[in-house]
Amino acid sequence: MAEGNSDYDHRAMKLQRNLRHCEGKRLELERELFQHSSSDAHICHLKYMKLKNSLKEVCERGKKAHLRNQAFLQEFDLIEARLFGLISNANALQKKKMQLKSHPPEMNKGPNMSRSTYHPATIFMGRQMSASSSIEHCLTQRKSPQPTKSFSISDPHSVRQAAMNRNVTDSCVVPANSDIQCLNKPDKIDGNTSFQLSQKMPVTSVASSEDGRTHRAQIDKSQSGRKHLVESKQSAQLSTQILERLSPENRARDLQNDSPGNMVEKSLMYERLVPNEESFTHANPSGASPDACDYINNQTSDKHSARENLSETIESHLIPEEEDKQCLDSSSDLTVSISESEDDSYPPCEVNRIEVNQNDEKNLYTALPKQETVILKNYEQSSVIQPLQTSEVNSCDESSSASTISQSNLSDEGFFHLLQSIERMVLLREQGGMELYQRAGINQKQLLRLISVCNRMGALRVEDLEACCALVLCKTQELLKSTFVGYSHEATAGIHNTDESKERFLSRKCQERLLGHIAFLNKHHILNEKVLPECFTSVMMLSDGQNSCKSVENVENSTEDGNVPQVSSTMKDDPLTIKPRQIVQELYKTTGSSHQEFETQVHPGVVLQSANISVESNTQAEEENDEDEISDLSEIYIPGLTVEEGNATTKASKKQISETSFSSSEKSPISRKEDKNIQPNYMKSNNMSTGNKFSKVVTTVKSKAFWGESEDSSSEIEAMLRPKTESVDDFDDFFD
């Protein structure tokens, strides 16, 4: 136990000694640390580090400030440049202002003043003149009470007079106060004052030293003193008005008032101030040659006669509204600009009004009062032309392209262009589900626009595809209806080969183009057998009928030699052959009602007389054809053919044919009219030959196939038996 306690004590004491030693070292280190921290070197080092950090922050702030100052400098440079520009402009404006203040414009220095200062528009008999000449007249006004300036018309072709047979020419007398209004005293013709319409033509001033014609337009000595006094007063008043208008503050207002409409009104007001109760004539001046005056009168008479014939050859087209408001050239001589051109067309409503005036053998514009003449002039410039509505269908021949085409009628070339444009638009819009040719109705305004574009071969828009299809249907219905009416007249009245009958039928070229268009639509799956317009069906039926008629015609030509009688009889009795009567009936069914509705839409209020005529002629044709089918065909003798139980055999002699034909010609007129329409079917089918060949085929059949040419029969008998191809009615009236 004692040994254990001694070891413990020994270790505890050792630990205490180590603890004292460590504590002494700690105190010594603390003392050294305190001394070091309180030394100057440590304090300087701390200050150094602090200053170094401060310097770094100052450098960063300096860089940012430098960038900001650079941006400010750039902005200041731009502002400075702008200010310099404004200052320079202000200096230039200030200099101009000082020049204007120091040198004000003086307008009354003399006749040699600058022409470029001011050009107020003046008017003389509805014509515009340059202002410089008017100012010169105004300046010379103070020297003489009534100075005049004469003018000669340089272009005699462009002169328009109020009457055709007037031997006195109007002299252009310009008073000195012509800055606002200059008028010519009107001639007195049968108590009616005429207001002359004017047109553009140059007027040159005649020098006083040239040919002694300076005073050729002076006031007539026979004029009353009262009228002269009134003109003097008006001249003095207008002279003062000119001087007031030349002031700078009134220039803007004068420029606004110098419009063509205001000029016409002012000229009318000024003309009312001058009493026109006393008639006077302008004597032929001594300086002017009478031949020149006669030449001018002849030219104006020709222009007036051409104006009277305008209503017969007028074509409706749009008149562009163009007004020349430019100032006259300062270096040019005195010129006259006239309000209208003589070649402008009139609207249809004005054409009717002009024709009424022509029945009274008066001038187109002389017969009207002055107020109505001004209204007529303004209407010609601003009115919209209404299209001429025509009920006739244009000819489908190629020669019709050279003739003038009405605006409301589609030509063949325009129709072909329309079909080609539709096909091109269909190819561009190659999509499924396009529904075209579903409606035939179209707005009248849109119809006229499309017709105008097609006639001019213009480009059509894709948006108008449905409207173009409707126009094709309408045009096809018109052609089919005209063809149907032509066939009806051929069947009833026996019209032969004339120009009028040729224009009725659908040309072969149009028909082939329509068939090609139908094939194109079928190829692109736009139309099929189930969905097909009635007019397209009629065109296809008409084409099939004409093809069958061609084959029958070829067979008939071969029967003249007696080679193929069997084939002709089979063609005649073939139930599949389309007869002309059937085609006409189908055409009427498909085109009659639809075309009547179309014309009611396009031309409301117009009575469709042609449709009624076609219905009556169709009824007559059906009755006659029914009688023809019921009648016995065995009584008809045809050269080389005999109809017996559906078989055809050749006859033994041709002399018997001529004898039977002669005996049949001695019937009564009534029976002759009935027998005239009795023909075999293969001969009736010739009536459906294409287009312009229709009348030619009928004439050939009657002259050769039916009557024949025999060597045994005499020429006189054949001449009596042969029917007249020129006029069937005269042949019938001979037996009445």
UniProtKB/Swiss-Prot annotation:
Q: Which GO terms describe its biological process?
A: spindle organization
Comp. bias (Basic and acidic residues): 210-219
Report the coiled-coil segments. Answer: 10-35
Q: Where in the cell is it found?
A: Cytoplasm, Cytoskeleton, Microtubule organizing center, Centrosome; Cytoplasm, Cytoskeleton, Cilium basal body
> Low complexity compositional bias: what residue ranges?
658-668
Where would you say this protein principally sits, based on its record?
Answer: cytoplasm
Matching entries from InterPro entries are given as: Centrosomal_kizuma
Describe its function.
Answer: Centrosomal protein required for establishing a robust mitotic centrosome architecture that can endure the forces that converge on the centrosomes during spindle formation. Required for stabilizing the expanded pericentriolar material around the centriole.
**Protein name in UniProt:** Centrosomal protein kizuna
- Organism of origin is Xenopus laevis (African clawed frog)
Source species taxonomy: Eukaryota, Metazoa, Chordata, Craniata, Vertebrata
